[in-house]
Structures are given as structure tokens and as C-alpha cells.
Regions:
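Phosphate- and other anionic-substrate recognition elements at nucleic-acid/protein interfaces
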Residues: 1-156
Length: 156
């Protein structure tokens, strides 16, 4: 099963693609989509780039991190922009007839690291270990790969 994980952001969106077979993982690709310009330009870039990745790799499922707002630091403007980025990703998956699944950040961390409030460095380290990578991926790409790994653990 090919799984595309996506860590949404209006400025940086991470993506990571793995192939999973009976909890054996094969790393295929990962990276970060860096956007510039107005909000509509950034959202369009996310949609176009995710759509190109879907069309190139033909994943069976797209995994996206569920949005949340920290109660100790509410930022409605950031949440709305994140919602726009998520909408672009969901639209790209839908327009290419891909199954889309969501996991909470804590669920992803608990599955990959073993604790729901793991630090980004711990997630990156475990992604590197599980995928047998020579070096740790960029933080946003590592989060996306962690989402893909999480789905593999939950569905295989």
C-alpha cells in the first residue's frame, strides 16, 4: 500500500510517501512545499503541488494531520489559514479519487514514538530509524512521514 502523509501549513507543507507491506516500510519520497505570495497564491501552490505528487506516485491513501488549536495560545487567524491549507490538500486528494484519512498530532506521535506529547526531534529520530534513512528528514517532512507510518500501523 502506498501512503502519502501530509503535514499542512500555509507557508510550509510537509509531505512524505512510503510503501507499506505487513509493517515493512519502503521510503519513496519526502519534502517540503514552501509557498510565497498572497494567501490565495499560497493555497493554490499547495493544491497544485500535492496534486502533482498524487498523480506521480498514485498513493492508495492520503493521510493528513487533524487540525487543532492550543487552548493556552489561541490564534484564530492561524487556524483559519491552516484550514485553507487543509482544504487545498483535501481537494487535491478528492479530485484524484484518493481515500483521505485524518489522525490527531498526539495519535501520530503516540503511534510512532510511543508517547503522545513527543518532541519534534523524537518524531524525526523515529522516522529516520523506522525508514532506515541515512539522515533525518526536515521537520515538516518528518511529521508527514510519521502520519503515513501511523496509518500503516493502524490499517495493516
Amino acid at each position: 500500500m502506498k501512503i502519502l502523509g501530509v503535514d499542512p501549513g500555509s507557508r510550509i507543507t510537509g509531505f512524505g510517501l512510503i510503501e507499506a507491506n505487513k509493517l515493512k516500510f519502503n521510503y519513496l519520497s519526502s519534502g517540503c512545499i514552501r509557498t510565497q505570495g498572497t494567501l490565495p497564491e499560497r493555497i493554490t501552490t499547495i493544491f497544485v503541488e500535492i496534486e502533482q505528487i498524487i498523480q506521480k506516485y498514485q498513493p492508495d491513501v492520503v493521510v493528513i494531520e487533524r487540525a487543532f488549536m492550543r487552548p493556552d495560545r489561541p490564534n484564530p487567524d492561524a487556524a483559519i489559514k491552516l484550514g485553507h491549507a487543509r482544504g487545498a490538500i483535501i481537494s487535491a486528494a478528492g479530485s484524484n479519487h484518493r481515500l483521505m484519512v485524518e489522525y490527531s498530532p498526539n495519535q501520530i506521535k503516540k503511534t510512532v514514538v510511543g508517547k503522545g506529547h513527543a518532541a519534534k526531534e523524537q518524531v524525526s529520530f523515529m522516522v529516520q530509524e523506522l525508514l532506515k534513512l541515512n539522515k533525518a528528514p526536515q521537520a515538516d517532512a518528518a511529521d508527514a512521514l510519521a502520519g503515513a507510518i501511523c496509518h500503516a500501523y493502524h490499517c495493516l
